[in-house]
Amino acid sequence: KFLAGRAYKKPEGEMKDEEYYRNSVETKDELIEELNQENYEEVISNNVEVIFGLASFKDEHTVNIKTAEEECDVYTERVFINTGASPFVPPIEGLKIEKRIHTNETLMDLEEYPETLAILGAGIIGLEFAATYAKFGSKVTIIDKASRLLPKEDADVAEEVFKSYKDLGVDFVFDADVSKVEQDESSVHIFYSSNGEKGELRANDFLVATGRKPNVEELKLENAGIES
């Protein structure tokens, strides 16, 4: 949200796009570090013990925790599972979150300004990042399987949203299935088919915004009788 706010406040002509973007990322990192420390101190000051490690259920009342130094079991009457979610990455040839291919979590750490950005997925996450980076000055292209923007919304509403993004300079490729992704040191090469025709797109960076999945893979929920 901080980066989005900075993008919409970008002053005209006072600073180069790449310089303003880099400054925004650095300020965001400083703010996150400060808030994390404040939140941690507030938690431990309220008689809460914090253990950093990998947790999994042994049974419905026992949680095993493996830290860098030791392993222990914690018994509890109740467990509140608050492990959040992580980005879902579809099984596409060559699609790995590394170098110039990002999720919404890693793109925000990108210090190098992307002059061109391709986004896979036109959901809320994809649209938010498209608007943010278009405001920063990037040339953004969104690739999506649907035949139009926001297919679950009324057509007239979706059309107005579509027009607002076109006004930002965002391009769209609809009815698209990505078959392969290649990347090198300077760009990402995206291969797709749309309406029976093959297409290709190159961009400096590629954001995968295809939804999220719960972080429960390591919890061994079945040991606690929890179905996921």
Which residues are covered by each model-predicted region?
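Rossmann-like NAD(P)H-binding beta-loop-alpha module
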Residues: 111-153
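Glycine-rich flavin
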Residues: 1-113, 146-150, 156-157, 164-168, ...
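Short hydrophobic core segments
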Residues: 55, 63, 74-84, 119-120, ...
